[in-house]
Swiss-Prot record:
Binding residue positions for Mg(2+) 1: D379, D383
The protein's name: (-)-beta-pinene synthase 1, chloroplastic
Source organism of this protein record: Pinus banksiana (Jack pine)
Gene encoding the protein: TPS-(-)Bpin1
Enzyme category, top tier: lyase
Sites where the protein binds Mg(2+) 2: D379, D383
Residues annotated as transit peptide in the record: 1-51
Source lineage: Eukaryota, Viridiplantae, Streptophyta, Embryophyta, Tracheophyta
Record localization: Plastid, Chloroplast
């Protein structure tokens, strides 16, 4: 199919001089041909009435007599007034100074861990407890050196059978070993999952202690948390996950409502791959503050809790300023006038804030929100609103990267084109400051390939073609938008991404491929029914059923869930594999973006229907301060 076709009444020429940066699978034919493109009036507005839990498809007839589909999405939940009238006192100097004093006090706690009541103490579990808690409370960025020193100490006593509470412990214990294994693996230490085999019985099964003390229960909590950091082929980790999950669910039915039961509930519900660091910190602050054992047995932990609360609230004052900037961009870009799309810029900003809440990463947070908003607009335009011919024109215009290319576009596309053009250029300028080199052409190539994948899907929809599962997934990994959502925001960070590192994090790396696969697979399992109602038959589910005659939707979903589980383990390996030439810190942000998207699809399409879990995330981490 020609990407550009000559319209019947051609009389006016549209000349575009620039050449595309990339040639993708879906080749563009020369754009410089005589085409008459009349500016299309903006379509008449339609009033879409939907409940917060459902999505309907609407068809409207625009002023050009073209029938266009809209998704029936609910409107923006966060108008300007909600954001502009946010107030917080935690930006004041007094709070920051108090936080700095607490940081010094907590650092002293780290440094004094070798002394207890004036005498030498070699408790390994004490060091692990401290590291684990500052990470779960979201304050670990202040203690990188102290954390490394503590974990180096723990690892120096690590054995094939694990560790005990202290260096002189003759018998290893499950709680120390499970927590130690998890923490060491997450920090890149080469620890084998085989260490858990020593906690199985003679017939190779994990067993629980009949006493079921709090210590026994915490051992199972840490075993479950450890089991989620599995690599491919680690059967003992699968066994540990199955056993500990069953144990914890049964335990919840027995114990009273308390801090431990809340901790178990949070761990079971959010695991690791959908437990965003700032969201985890907000939930754990409540749990940690209610744990009377922590507060009474060691008053030093009060410092941890106070610092965590202050840090959380101080960051909200930063978020308010950034949100005001994001709203200005959203309004200035003409986004409010794009009536056919979902407006989820505040939700996307919240996701970014939950995975990168260091103050200096403002460029990442704003860039991610802007990139995701653009991706959403393009997704709705290519999937629903635009005609195939219009979409071909838009894709070709993007490849020319010249504002004059808008002369060739329908009226409703002109503003969208300029939003993409200006924002990508602005993010490239930010990336150049951070990375010391021009990355615009590199970013443009990513956007071109991304739009090519959309054109392919638009052709499938227009012709009613149902591809094979493999064909669909390969294209779908690109059209998921993961790469373009991550690339430019990532480059604005204070993390070096020289070319040899970037190719191991971005395309064509296995890390990027797996991240894109998870987003496509999980997204399809949550969206396929609504997409079908909108006339989009193509999904992982339908393609799998085509390839496997007789397979039901349930069969397809089961297959995809097994695939997702395997991809997650592979992604764990790509992030944490020992002796990698790429630092974990360079890979972590792309990995965490995967976690953010995974969170949005945990129960439903949380981007189309953002009025449930996603709304709660905004309220908990963005709008509501923690009581001091």
């Amino acid at each position: 199919m020609d990407l550009i076709s000559v319209l019947p009444s051609a009389s006016k020429s549209c000349v575009c001089l620039h050449k595309p940066l990339s040639s993708s699978t879906h080749k563009l034919k020369p754009f410089c041909r005589t085409i008459r493109i009349l500016g299309m009036p903006r379509p008449r507005k339609s009033v879409l009435m939907v409940s917060s839990m459902s999505i309907s498809v609407n068809t409207l007839v625009s002023d050009d007599a073209v029938q266009r589909r809209t998704g029936g999405y609910h409107s923006n939940l966060w108008n300007d007034d909600v954001i502009q009238f946010l107030s917080t006192p935690y930006g004041e100097l007094a709070y920051r100074e108090r936080a700095e004093r607490l940081i010094d006090e907590v650092r002293n706690i780290f440094n004094s861990m070798s002394l207890e009541d004036g005498e030498f103490s070699d408790l390994i579990i004490q060091r692990l407890w401290m590291v684990d808690n500052v990470e779960r409370l979201g304050i670990d960025r202040h203690f990188k050196n102290e954390i490394k020193s503590a974990l180096d100490y723990v690892y120096s006593y690590w054995s094939q059978k694990g560790i005990g509470c202290g260096t002189k412990s003759i018998i290893t214990d499950l709680n120390s070993t499970a927590l130690g294994f998890r923490t060491l693996r997450l920090h890149g230490y080469p620890v084998s999952a085989d260490v858990l085999k020593h906690f199985r019985n003679q017939i190779g099964q994990f067993v629980s202690c009949p006493s079921e003390t709090e210590e026994d229960i915490r051992s199972m909590v840490n075993l479950y948390r450890a089991s989620l950091i599995a690599f491919p082929g680690e059967e003992v980790m699968e066994e540990a996950e199955s056993f500990s999950e069953k144990y914890l669910k049964e335990t919840l039915q027995k114990i009273p409502d308390c801090s431990l039961s809340r901790e178990i509930g949070d761990v079971l519900e959010h695991g690791w791959h959908t437990n965003l660091p700032r969201f985890e910190a907000r939930n754990y602050i409540d749990v940690f503050g209610q744990d009377t054992k922590n507060m009474e047995s060691n008053r030093k932990t009060e410092k941890l809790l106070e610092l965590a609360k202050l840090e959380f609230n101080i960051f909200q004052s930063i978020q308010k300023t950034e949100l005001e900037s994001l709203l200005r961009w959203w309004n200035d870009s003409g986004s409010p006038q794009i009536t056919f799309t979902r407006h989820r810029h505040v939700e996307y900003y919240t996701l970014a804030s939950c995975i990168a809440f260091e103050p200096q990463h403002s460029g990442f947070r704003l860039g991610f929100a802007k990139a995701c908003h653009i991706i959403t607009v393009l997704d709705d335009m290519y999937d629903l609103f635009g005609t195939v011919e219009e979409l071909k024109l838009f894709t070709a215009a993007i490849k020319r990267w010249d504002p004059s290319a808008t002369d060739c576009l329908p009226q409703y596309m002109k503003g969208i084109y300029m939003m993409v053009y200006n924002t990508v250029n602005e993010m490239s300028a930010e990336a150049q400051k951070a990375q010391g080199r021009d990355t615009l052409n590199y970013a443009r190539q990513a956007w071109e390939v991304y739009l090519d994948s959309y054109v392919q899907e638009a052709k499938w929809i227009a012709t009613g073609y149902l591809p094979t599962f493999e064909e669909y997934l390969e294209n779908g990994k690109v059209s998921s938008g993961h790469r373009v959502s991550a690339l430019q925001p990532m480059l604005t960070m204070d993390i070096p991404f020289p070319p040899h590192i970037l190719k191991e994090v971005d395309f064509p790396s296995n890390l990027n491929d797996l991240a894109c696969a998870i987003l496509r697979l999980r997204g399809d399992t949550r969206c396929y029914q609504e997409d079908r109602a909108r006339g989009e038959e193509t999904s992982c589910i339908s393609c799998y059923m085509k390839d496997n005659p007789g397979a039901t939707e349930e069969d397809a979903l089961n297959h995809l869930n097994v695939m997702i589980s395997g991809v997650i383990k592979e992604l764990n390996w790509e992030l944490l594999k020992p002796d990698s030439s790429v630092p974990i810190s360079s890979k972590k942000i792309n990995f965490d973006i995967t976690r953010a998207f995974h969170y949005g699809y945990k129960y439903r399409d949380g981007y189309s229907v953002s009025s449930v879990e996603t709304k709660s995330l905004v309220m908990r981490t963005l709008l509501e301060p923690v009581p001091l």
